[in-house]
Structures are given as C-alpha cells and as structure tokens.
Amino acid sequence: MGERKGQNKYYPPDFNPEKHGSLNRYHNSHPLRERARKLSQGILVIRFEMPYNIWCDGCKNHIGMGVRYNAEKKKVGNYYTTPIYRFRMKCHLCVNYIEMQTDPANCDYVIVSGASRKEERWDMEDNEQVLTTEHEKKEKLETDAMFRLEHGEADRSTLKKALPTLSHIQEAQNAWKDDFALNSMLRRHFREKKKAMQEEEEKDQALQAKASLAIPLVPESEDDRRLAALLRLHTLDSYEDKQRMKRTEIIHRSWFPSAQGPSASSSKASSVLKKLCQGRRPPPSSTGTVGDLGIVRRKSRDVPESPQCAADNSLSEEQRRPPGTTQGSKTLEEAAEASRTSKTSESKRNCSDQAFPLGSSQEDLLNPNTPNASLVADYSDSESE
C-alpha cells in the first residue's frame, strides 16, 4: 500500500478537470507551500549555504563558510546562456540583509551588499594549478598553426620543469605498489613497537612498586640520560655490609699494641699517681697524741739527705756542666752556679718528697692512723753501754 499513497488523492464532487486542471489550482495552493508565497514576483525561497567566510557589515560578526539561511532567489540576468541568480538573506545575528549573486564567468559568488568577503583566494598560476583554457584560446589553437606551435613549445618547457617532480611521484607510487609487503612490514613494525611498550611498562611498574610511587612515569628522554650521567648516587651501606667491614678490619688488625711515646706514657703515669695519692689521703684524726704513744720526735730541724739523693745531685751537676769549659771563665761559672743552685733546691725538694710522701707531713707520719705513718725513735739521750 505504500506505493499508492502518492496517487490516492481525494477529488471532491465539484472538481472539474477542464476548469481546475489540478488539485493545487482547485485548492489555490502550490506544491512548495510557504516557499512559493512570492512566486508571482519571480522570487522563490530556498536554503542557501554560505560559500566562503564573510563579515557582516551590520554587526561586524564573522559568518563561517557552510552556514545556511532561508534566502530569496530570483533571476537578474544571463552570462551567455547561463542565468545569473541573486540571493537575499537576513543575518541571524542582526537585522542586516546580505545580497549575493552568482558569477558564471569566474565560477564564483560575488557579494553585492551587506557583507565583506574574507580574502582567502590565490592565483592558480602562482599555485601551479591547472588553468582552464578559455574559449578564444581554444579556437586559436584549432585555426592558427603558428600559435599552436608556440603553445606546444611552452608546453614542452613546462614538462621539462615538472619532470623531476613527476619522477619523484612515480617512484613514490612504485614504492607503495606491493600492498602485501607493505602490510607485512607495517604489522611487523607495530608488533616490535608493542613489545617495546610492554617492556617499558613492566619496568615502570617494577620501579613504582619498589619506590611505592602512585604517580605515572613519563618516558625518559636523551636530556634525562645526559643529566643522570652527571650525577653520582652514594647509597647507604646496609647492616650486613657494615658488619662485614668491621670483621675485615678486625682480621687485618695487628695482634700487638702500637708503642706509645715516652712523654705520653710518663704523663699518663704521673696523672695516675696523683689520682691515687689524692684518693689515699685520709681525713685528719683527733684521737691519740704523740705523748700517749710514747714516741719522741727528733730534735734536728733539717732532714738529712739520703745517699741516693746526694748521688743524684752530684751526677746532675756533672751532666749539666758544658764540655770544654775552663775554670777561669767567669760567665760560664756564674751561669753554672745559678743552674746548680736551682737544681740543688729542686733535688732537695724531691728528696723531701721521698722522705715524706705526697700529701703527708711529719705529723701525718707520727699519726699511727695514717696509712703512710712510720715510727721514728730518738735515742740521743740514752746512754750507750
């Protein structure tokens, strides 16, 4: 039934084909409906598409190529036998009207009023495009032999100039002639690239898992490699490496202690002795006196030097005497006498320190409670038998 819809029309009883001719005349209508409302004036409303970019003169807005309008179309002239049509339309952004018409001579559209064209045209000859041959030139080529000969020479010179380009195009076409080989090469290239991408993705995932990174990694570049080569990373040794280094150091260490200098050993020994003497000094005790113990202190004021101290003093004086000195030199004698006097006093002090230990006196020695005390008896008043 679908193919009969266009034919099944209702004809009223008063319809007379001789009088009305058609149903459109009977209903006083047109098949194009509203688009033919100005058909009596020779104007037909059509859908016009903008052929190029323009600027509206009313609102100064840009109207792009391909925008469609309801335009009034009418015939305004002929170019030879080709009619020239004019289109009038209203801008959709303002109340301005734009008029354009065809240009059969140049195969183009011309703006009559209401807009200005965005100039994007170029010369076909400068663009090395194929130019259309005009009608007069065609007639001249057919009738004038000399003009045809000159035109042939110009064509041959143009061919010589275009020969390298044509040969390059031909080589490119021959290179892409074998479809199967090209398809195989392209698929092989895609497989290699896909494999490389998978390996790179696995490396990135391993690095992200090792460093606990949640950010995506970008592919490295040549600048990144050059910058990384200039840097030196010093990683911290692990606990096992430190233990291994300590054991290696212990193994290669000498079994015997290194010998220290005499000055260091003597200073260390003297400091230890002073600490011991200070620690052994007891607090003074008030219990007991010398009379209670029955001990009489020696009446002599000077403490006699021990034989060892006297020998040391004489030996030190002989060593300090410079060799080759004469008895008659007063300067050397005075210097030796001064040094001898100072050294003698120092030796006496040392001997007294030996008689009375460090931190002790005669009273401390007479005190029996002290650890360094010693009993001294005086028998000068007793009669020898």
Curated annotation (Swiss-Prot):
Top-rank taxon, per record: Eukaryota
Positions where Phosphoserine occurs in the chain: 40, 306
Lineage: Eukaryota, Metazoa, Chordata, Craniata, Vertebrata
Subcellular location: Nucleus
InterPro entries: Saf4/Yju2
Record-level GO cellular component terms: nucleus
Any Pfam family matching the protein: Saf4_Yju2
Record's protein name: Probable splicing factor YJU2B
Signal peptide: none
The keyword Thylakoid appears for this protein: no
Family note: Belongs to the CWC16 family.
Purpose: May be involved in mRNA splicing.
GO BP term, example: response to virus
Low complexity: bias regions: 258-271
Stretches assigned to coiled coil: 182-214
Region Disordered: start-end pairs: 1-26, 257-385
Location, primary (coarse class): nucleus
Keywords in alphabetical order: Coiled coil, Nucleus, Phosphoprotein
Bias (Polar residues) ranges: 359-373
Key word Translocase present: no
Gene encoding the protein: Yju2b
